[in-house]
Amino acid sequence: MSKIPSVNIKELLDAGVHFGHKTSRWNPKMGSYIYGERDDVHIIDLRQSAVLMSVALNAIYETVKKDGKILFVSTKIQASDIIAEYAEKCGQYYVNHRWLGGMLTNWKTIAGSIEKLNKLEKTLGNEEALMGYTKKEILDMSRKKDKLLLSLAGIRNLNSKPDLLVVIDTNKEHIAINEAVKLNVPIVAVVDTNSNPDNVDYPIPGNDDSIRSIRLYCSLFADAALQGLAESMKASGVDMGAIQEHTDKALTSKSVSKLKQTKKFSKMKNIDEETNTEFEQALNDADKNKNSENA
């Protein structure tokens, strides 16, 4: 059984995962993941979010367990630093500024840019070599290095296509998703109410704008990857005492077939009554708190 992070509805609710976009901005393909609307804002069905997050976390865990590589992608401002932080935490790869066209499909060009970055760093770190350059030339090299680092820092050690792509905001990262589809790289993605989930293998219905939500997603992703790494190292005979334990609860992953994902929640048999009750209670508690604050 995989020891990946547990997901509970209250945690998702507290992070604002249930808040979608204004009802006028929705994508009809997300209809089966929407619980309802309040104040002209769609409310995401966290019962499905919890189950599908479990499925996605298991995919991350299994990928790393089998020594696969994961590429985290989100170039939006509020996610940029968070993506880098958690990707580095679990020893994986990331793109958190601009996605350069061809990062996956034209790797030869990207590899050339990485080689250029390495040469610039080597030159700038050699005081003797810098003696032959003017101050302006050194400044130009430094600027080129910084520009390349913004785009390539998180993938400079990636020497082949990733085994799994993890995306926050499918609309903004549509180029990355299209490239992954062309190369048959499976995709985990947070899909908001204005998203198109069609090309996503492991969709997670949720708010893709809130910093609290994004941090929660990335924390869960990183912990699942670390658990996969621990299993991989254990299988290789590595001393497990060197690996920090990040979770103390085992999660039983609940599977949802792609056919059932297109149906309304009420028809999905994989979500139990306990999850139903938890979601309804969490929403009621949130309403009570809101009403008491406005009283």
From Swiss-Prot:
Key word Ribosomal protein present: yes
CDD domains the UniProt entry points to: RPS2
SUPFAM superfamilies: Ribosomal protein S2 (SSF52313)
GO MF, one example: structural constituent of ribosome
Record InterPro entries: Ribosomal_uS2 (IPR001865), Ribosomal_uS2_bac/mit/plastid (IPR005706), Ribosomal_uS2_CS (IPR018130), Ribosomal_uS2_flav_dom_sf (IPR023591)
Record-level GO cellular component terms: cytosolic small ribosomal subunit
Keyword Ribosomal protein belongs to the record: yes
Annotated keywords: Ribonucleoprotein, Ribosomal protein
Gene Ontology terms: biological process: translation
Sequence similarity: Belongs to the universal ribosomal protein uS2 family.
Full protein name: Small ribosomal subunit protein uS2
UniProt gene name: rpsB
